[in-house]
């Protein structure tokens, strides 16, 4: 799962991060705590069960920083 991060250095590859879930009327979104990065929106079928993940990549692009996490599900 990919998250958008606004500033560099808030998480590192290999770090275990806590995730919180937000609910919209027809989808869910996830935040790396404490409000470090936010995911896009996911449908019910894509909903995460895990609340901890491991950072496997941090990529800098012209649009910002993108954090990729893996979850044991």
Range-by-range predicted roles:
Residues 64-73:
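Short solvent-exposed strand/turn elements
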Residues 42-52:
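Short coil-to-beta-strand transition motifs
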Residues 14-17:
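Loop/turn positions that initiate beta-strands
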Residues 24-36:
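Short, Lys/Arg- and Gly-enriched loop/turn segments at beta-strand edges
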């Amino acid at each position: 799962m990919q998250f958008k991060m606004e500033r560099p250095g808030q998480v590192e590859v290999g770090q275990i991060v806590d995730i919180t879930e937000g609910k919209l009327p027809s989808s869910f979104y996830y935040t790396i705590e404490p409000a470090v990065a936010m995911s896009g929106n996911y449908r019910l079928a894509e909903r995460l069960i895990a609340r901890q993940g491991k950072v496997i990549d941090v990529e800098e692009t012209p649009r910002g920083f993108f954090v990729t996490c893996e979850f044991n599900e």
